[in-house]
From Swiss-Prot:
A biological process from GO: translation
Any Gene Ontology CC annotation: ribosome
Top-level taxon in the UniProt lineage: Eukaryota
Coiled-coil ranges from the UniProt annotation: none
SMART domains, sorted: Ribosomal_S15
Stored InterPro entries: Ribosomal_uS15, Ribosomal_uS15_bac-type, uS15_NS1_RNA-bd_sf
Entry protein name: Small ribosomal subunit protein uS15c
NCBIfam families with a match to the protein in the record: S15_bact (TIGR00952)
Length: 91
């Protein structure tokens, strides 16, 4: 429940800001990933959803790589807010 609450707070703040920003796009992908992950826990043989999840994961990974190259501070803040792991390639 804590993750959902923190995501809701971030989304309310981001709704007033730029929706086209990299941070907002990563936030939306993270929200979709968490929703699909919970769906796949119930429906293990839903292979189309698995494929969609892999696509979204790749898009989020590319955006995170872009953000880490552009601004390390914004990248660190975002992964802390969304409770994501920092990969070794982005350090």
């Amino acid at each position: 429940m804590v993750k959902n609450l923190s995501i809701w707070v971030i989304s309310q703040k981001e709704n007033k800001e730029n929706r086209g920003s990299v941070e907002f796009q990563i936030f939306n992908f993270t929200k979709k990933i968490r929703r699909l992950t919970s769906h796949l826990k119930l429906h293990k043989k839903d292979f189309l959803s698995q494929k969609g999840l892999r696509k979204i994961l790749g898009k989020r990974q590319r955006l995170l790589a872009y953000l880490s190259k552009k601004s390390k501070i914004r990248y660190k803040d975002l992964i802390d807010k969304l409770e994501l792991r920092d990969t070794k390639t982005h350090q």
